[in-house]
């Protein structure tokens, strides 16, 4: 906590005890304001936590924050609700004494949220097991259920607790939460039937209508519109922007399941809730005798079905009153006003009893399941008191009177225990106690609860006396009995000024929190809390198990008059005070910053009023009764030892002696401090502040010194580490190199030995002596083969294999060739395939037979040498639509005279055509083509031999083509005459016609020459090429 003192000017001090002007209310408020502005909502008064409701979500409740406070000393961290929770838990574990945390403050100050945060802290930080996790879940989930049935929106608070709650959380010897128990106090049942303007009924009604499933609402006879129910419209505030009833409904349903309510229990519980809504819609009318009669029969049927009672009996119980006089039973009819009273009384009774049943069943779910007596005996508890805050409304009635009486008792307990704990600490430390003046509210508690003369006793007496007792007769008796009390006044005994602010039906006690006007209207009815006997009888016969448990039949036979509500509440408070007095208390005082429920708004007038009536200034004065600050010697010495040369850096003696030396060095004056048995007490905050400022200055020098030492240490550590690492690396590397060399030598010797032996036995069958050598030879050959593989099918190179691998080498060679061929074939296109097929045919026919064949090999064969535009369309039409496969320009030599003429040779699938421009000169069917002759020289002439029996034919045809190899290959393939091509050396004879024969003489020469010789032959001179 001392760490925050350096920022005290901006964010205030974390402990009000450290305020210099601690008696100043303005200084107190200003410190609250500074912290509230910085979202620091928690501040200490010694061990008391003051909490200001921020009215917004703050990022200070995560698991990381919980871990920060877990197991840490109370003053080592900033103020927080978790610090209070952890301090109580650690005290429970170490001292084995039951603890309690008292949360107080006015309505809307955040008490309920504080209790939930404490439960969440225990759920997260305490030891866990499967059983413990179940208990944790049930403890946490009991909150939304109780809030739904016991909380409501008021003018001051959208989630105001309308009942008091004290919860014991039980822990086993390991510190794990293993059970719990809840006590509830004074549920505000009147809210069921009436709400002030701007307020709502209990949350559960709106949650059921807004979030309930259609089928559920149908079974309960409800619809979603809250405006249709009389008990929900009186406050004219059914919807609230800050409340999500639909989402809350899902939370409540899930919570009911977690705390062990089955579906039947939930259905029966909701049936009662729905019956209350229907009950509010029951209407009456007067008959001729002014007796009340029910006019809404449907509502009666719904209620009877939901509560599982007889409809007729229930209707009669609402409009008649059973009176037992001298052993005789009489049914007295009710008028309209009485019937409405009976209806509302029953609604309040059944809701109040159902709430009590709900708490009892939650307690069964939370009950400690210790398996043996020892386990039960070792269980300790931490109590959480979340009870209604002090309330002052425009109209204050019986409920506000009871609530404020409860707050008076808690304030009295707080003062007593605070003073007591302070006095005990001073006495245990051997320091004289200085009495503190404070307002003792015992006089107000006595005004309310004193026997015979207290307000409760007078109210009970008026309720029980025979005759016509009314609220006004109660007020008159109150005035007669306590009119002289200094803290009590009524309109009758007030002065002129006071009477203007006090009604004739009101009385005003002076509470510790201020004056409150209470209207006595309804005091007697609410205190009696009467329910007509015949309504009880009908409910005792209910088939709804919950209703049956809520209305015990012994009530009908018990002759003893039940205690009044006020007396029950007083007795419950007395028992609660005993419980709290038996435990070690911790306090959380909650403050509401404004009435508008707005974030970041600080209403100084409202806060000053709360600070005053909560007695916070008195609390600071008690804590500062002589000394503002106290710490154990060990903690004080550890923090401030650097300020004294004799205690820095370490003190070897007792901590108390070290502190004595330290404060002497700091120059503390005797009146500024006292030395206790285990603690040092500092009287003035300025003394502590001066010490803290000196420490902050000293920290700078220490930080510089530590930085220098640390940097030197780090550099030396790094150097030594590097040196050590270098030596290790050198050592390892040398060893590694040496080991590698030795291993290599051993390996080399072994290899040489095996290699030599293998060489000697290399020609023997495989055996241990030669297997290494043979493997090496095989490996070497394969590696050499891998590097020298043929690159194409034309590459015939192949490494020479060793004798032992001859057969394997041939197989590999064949596989390699097949693979290359397969890969090559896979890559070629259909066009290239056709080209190769033609080239293969050309090779078969002309290779090594005709001189100009080699020049044709690298040249691609063209599909046609003439385009369609070069061939006359009439010719194409005369071809009888035969598909043209090849066309080439040629030179035709006449049979007589051998005159050359330009022609076109056109090939189809069945016929060859010789064409002269637009005239078809000759048609040669392939069937009549007997052969083809060509010379072996480099000329381009060839002869097509045709059968002469066909009159259409004119004899053989002599042609010349510049692409003779391509042309003849195409003819051979198309006409299927591959084996009919004759390559002739010397002369070629051919038929001219009419049985005559022509001769072509081929002779080698220097250049190509075609001419008619003198002997009548066609002479062809062709150069001889060396390529063949």
Swiss-Prot record:
Main location group: cytoplasm
Top-level division of the source organism's lineage: Eukaryota
Transmembrane feature ranges: none
Signal peptide: none
A cellular component term, taken from the record's GO annotations: myosin complex
Sequence positions bearing N6-methyllysine: 348
Residue ranges of the region described as Actin-binding: 573-595
UniProt name for this protein: Unconventional myosin-Ic-A
Domain TH1 as annotated: residue spans: 850-1024
Record's function text: Myosins are actin-based motor molecules with ATPase activity. Unconventional myosins serve in intracellular movements. Their highly divergent tails are presumed to bind to membranous compartments, which would be moved relative to actin filaments. Involved in egg activation by coupling dynamic actin to membrane.
Subcellular compartments: Cytoplasm; Cell membrane; Cell projection, Stereocilium membrane
Keyword Membrane found: yes
Subunit structure: Interacts (via its IQ motifs) with calmodulin.
Domain IQ: 699-728, 722-751
Keywords: Acetylation, Actin-binding, ATP-binding, Cell membrane, Cell projection, Cytoplasm, Membrane, Methylation, Motor protein, Myosin, Nucleotide-binding, Repeat
CDD domains, per database record: MYSc_Myo1
Domain Myosin motor: 12-696
GO molecular-function terms, A-Z: actin filament binding; ATP binding; microfilament motor activity
Binding site for ATP: 105-112
Family membership: Belongs to the TRAFAC class myosin-kinesin ATPase superfamily. Myosin family.
């Amino acid at each position: 906590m001392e760490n925050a003192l350096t920022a005290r000017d901006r964010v205030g001090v974390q402990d009000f005890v450290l305020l210099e002007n601690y008696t100043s209310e303005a200084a107190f408020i200003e410190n609250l304001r500074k912290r509230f502005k910085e979202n620091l909502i928690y501040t200490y008064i010694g061990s008391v936590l003051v909490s200001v409701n921020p009215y917004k979500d703050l990022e200070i409740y995560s698991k990381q924050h919980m871990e920060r406070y877990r197991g840490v000393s109370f003053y080592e961290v900033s103020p927080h609700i978790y610090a209070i929770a952890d301090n109580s838990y650690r005290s429970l574990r170490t001292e084995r004494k039951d603890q309690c945390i008292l949360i107080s403050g006015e309505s809307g100050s955040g008490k309920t949220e504080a209790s939930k945060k404490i439960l969440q802290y225990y759920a997260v930080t305490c030891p866990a097991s499967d059983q413990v996790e179940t208990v944790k879940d049930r403890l946490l989930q009991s909150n939304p259920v109780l809030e739904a049935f016991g909380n409501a929106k008021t003018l001051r608070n959208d989630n105001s607790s309308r009942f008091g709650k004290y919860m014991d959380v039980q822990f086993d010897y390991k510190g794990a939460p293993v059970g719990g128990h809840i006590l509830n106090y004074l549920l505000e049942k009147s809210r069921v039937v009436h709400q002030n303007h701007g307020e709502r009924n209990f949350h559960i009604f709106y949650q059921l209508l807004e979030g309930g499933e259609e089928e559920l609402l149908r079974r309960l006879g409800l619809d979603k519109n809250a405006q249709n129910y009389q008990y929900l419209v009186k406050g004219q505030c059914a919807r609230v922007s800050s409340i999500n009833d639909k989402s809350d409904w899902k939370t409540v349903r899930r919570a009911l399941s977690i705390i062990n309510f089955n579906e039947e229990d939930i259905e029966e519980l909701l049936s009662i809730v729905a019956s209350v809504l229907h009950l509010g819609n029951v209407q009456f009318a007067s008959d001729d005798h002014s007796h009340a009669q029910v006019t809404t029969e449907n509502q009666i049927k719904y209620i009877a079905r939901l509560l599982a009672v007889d409809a007729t009996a229930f209707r009669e119980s609402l409009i008649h009153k059973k009176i037992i006089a001298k052993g005789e039973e009489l049914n007295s009819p009710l008028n309209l006003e009485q019937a409405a009273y009976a209806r509302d009384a029953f609604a309040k009774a059944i809701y109040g009893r159902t709430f009590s049943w709900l708490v009892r069943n939650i307690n069964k779910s939370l009950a400690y399941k210790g398996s043996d007596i020892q386990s039960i005996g070792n269980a300790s508890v931490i109590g959480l008191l979340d009870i209604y805050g002090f309330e002052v409304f425009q109209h204050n009635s019986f409920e506000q009177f009871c609530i404020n009486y409860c707050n008076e008792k808690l304030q009295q307990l707080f003062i007593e225990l605070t003073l007591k704990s302070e006095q005990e600490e001073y006495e245990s430390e051997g320091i004289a106690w200085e009495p503190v003046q404070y307002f003792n509210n015992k006089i107000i508690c006595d005004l309310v609860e004193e026997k015979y003369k207290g307000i409760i006793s007078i109210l009970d007496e008026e309720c029980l006396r025979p005759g016509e007792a009314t609220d006004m007769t109660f007020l008159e008796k109150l005035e007669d009995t306590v009119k002289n009390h200094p803290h009590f006044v009524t309109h009758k005994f007030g002065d002129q000024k006071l009477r203007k602010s006090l009604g004739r039906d009101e009385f005003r006690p002076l509470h510790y929190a201020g004056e409150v006007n209470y209207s006595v209207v309804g005091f007697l009815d609410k205190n009696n809390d009467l329910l007509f006997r015949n309504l009880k009888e009908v409910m005792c016969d209910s088939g709804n198990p919950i209703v049956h448990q809520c209305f015990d039949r012994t009530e009908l036979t018990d002759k003893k008059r039940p205690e009044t509500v006020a007396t029950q509440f007083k007795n419950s408070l007395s028992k609660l005070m005993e419980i709290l007095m038996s435990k070690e208390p911790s306090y959380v005082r909650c403050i509401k910053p404004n009435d508008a429920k707005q974030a970041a708004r600080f209403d100084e007038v409202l806060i000053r009023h709360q600070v005053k009536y909560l007695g916070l200034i008195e609390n600071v004065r008690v804590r500062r009764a002589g000394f503002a600050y106290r710490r154990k010697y060990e903690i004080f010495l550890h923090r401030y030892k650097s300020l004294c040369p004799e205690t820095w850096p370490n003190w070897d003696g007792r901590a108390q002696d070290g502190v004595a030396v330290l404060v002497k060095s700091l120059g503390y004056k005797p009146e500024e401090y006292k030395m206790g048995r285990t603690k040092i007490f500092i009287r003035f905050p300025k003394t502590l502040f001066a010490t803290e400022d000196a420490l902050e200055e000293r920290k700078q020098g220490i930080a510089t010194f530590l930085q220098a030492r640390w940097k030197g240490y780090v550099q030396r550590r790094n150097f030594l580490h590097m040196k050590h690492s270098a030596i290790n690396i050198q050592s390892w590397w040398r060893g590694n190199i040496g080991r590698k060399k030795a291993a290599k030598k051993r390996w080399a010797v072994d290899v040489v030995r095996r290699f030599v032996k293998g060489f000697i036995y290399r020609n023997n069958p495989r055996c241990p002596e030669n297997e290494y050598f043979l493997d090496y030879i095989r490996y070497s050959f394969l590696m050499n083969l891998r590097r020298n593989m043929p690159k194409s099918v034309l590459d015939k190179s192949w490494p020479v294999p060793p004798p032992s691998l001859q057969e394997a080498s041939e197989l590999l060679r064949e596989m390699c060739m097949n693979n290359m061929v397969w890969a090559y074939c896979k890559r070629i296109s259909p066009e290239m395939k056709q080209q190769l097929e033609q080239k293969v045919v050309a090779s078969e026919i002309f290779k090594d037979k005709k001189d100009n064949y080699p020049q044709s090999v690298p040249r691609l064969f063209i599909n046609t040498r003439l385009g369609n535009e070069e061939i006359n369309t009439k010719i194409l039409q005369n071809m009888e639509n035969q598909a043209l496969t090849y066309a080439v320009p040629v030179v035709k030599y006449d049979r007589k005279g051998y005159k050359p003429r330009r022609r076109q040779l056109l090939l189809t699938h069945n016929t060859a055509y010789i064409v002269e421009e637009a005239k078809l000169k000759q048609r040669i069917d392939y069937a009549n083509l007997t052969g083809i002759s060509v010379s072996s020289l480099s000329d381009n002439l060839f002869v097509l031999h045709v059968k002469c029996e066909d009159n259409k034919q004119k004899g053989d045809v002599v042609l010349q083509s510049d692409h003779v190899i391509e042309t003849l290959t195409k003819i051979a393939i198309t006409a299927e005459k591959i084996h009919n091509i004759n390559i002739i050396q010397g002369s070629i004879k051919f038929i001219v016609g009419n049985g005559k024969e022509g001769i072509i003489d081929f002779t080698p020469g220097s250049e190509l020459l075609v001419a008619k010789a003198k002997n009548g032959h066609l002479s062809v001179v062709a150069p001889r090429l060396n390529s063949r």
